[in-house]
């Protein structure tokens, strides 16, 4: 068996920044540091931060007074921000800047009284945060659609004063079909010049297509609650290549590779490279050889840290 590695894979700039914000806060201020929701959707990362003193909660009413709170990379609603401000909590915002860009778009549509359609997955924290940027007091509404059927059933107040945005971690192919359906039903709909799916999601989906085309089996390292990791697995399967989503080497089953000659490995944007290396080691223990890195797009994007966390404490 030969191992092929997708390129790029693993951490993106937004995930790097979010994890570093928690790490720096722990170093500068000491534990406990409270984090609203998992800072990124990866079991290994969350457990590591928890062991260092991060406390993960789902709502701010689980947070004591006079502590530091970090908002996760997925973003939060305006109501959550107002709740934190009302309690005087010290907040560091780890929202991915590309998610913040979508928030700004929604807020602008809201101020203009323009109704907004969000393409995304119900229940995902990024979707909840983005929906929560819309202020309906101006007379508009924000609607969530997941697929073309939702578009067909959608009832809006003014089809000529309408715009759309998208969740950043969707399947590019699926999203293109939904956008086409929106433009067909609402010819005057506005939106971004390109969809809001982030560069890292696009690059990893392109890379997994190449991987699935060249391999007999594809492994996606990522946690089950990771949206972008699930999209990678689905994309490989649509290309008729068996694909499995795994947290790490402990999830591997040897029977998956019966008759396989080429095994492809990629990782979602919230999965650290150490987990990929563990998978490679296990496959090599079962007789796999090599670990060929495929050609792919170079990523050199970085996002800045909050000012108070840019210099490590000397204490």
UniProtKB/Swiss-Prot annotation:
Pathway: Isoprenoid biosynthesis; dimethylallyl diphosphate biosynthesis; dimethylallyl diphosphate from (2E)-4-hydroxy-3-methylbutenyl diphosphate: step 1/1; Isoprenoid biosynthesis; isopentenyl diphosphate biosynthesis via DXP pathway; isopentenyl diphosphate from 1-deoxy-D-xylulose 5-phosphate: step 6/6. Its EC number is 1.17.7.4. (2E)-4-hydroxy-3-methylbut-2-enyl diphosphate binds at residues 41, 74, 124, 168, 226-228, 270. The active site is at 126 (proton donor). This is 4-hydroxy-3-methylbut-2-enyl diphosphate reductase. The keyword Metal-binding applies. Gene3D superfamilies: 3.40.50.11270, 4-hydroxy-3-methylbut-2-enyl diphosphate reductase, catalytic domain (3.40.1010.20). GO terms for molecular function: 4 iron, 4 sulfur cluster binding; 4-hydroxy-3-methylbut-2-enyl diphosphate reductase activity; metal ion binding. Dimethylallyl diphosphate binds at residues 41, 74, 124, 226-228, 270. [4Fe-4S] cluster binds at residues 12, 96, 198. Pfam families: LYTB. NCBIfam families: ispH_lytB, PRK01045.1-2, PRK01045.1-4.
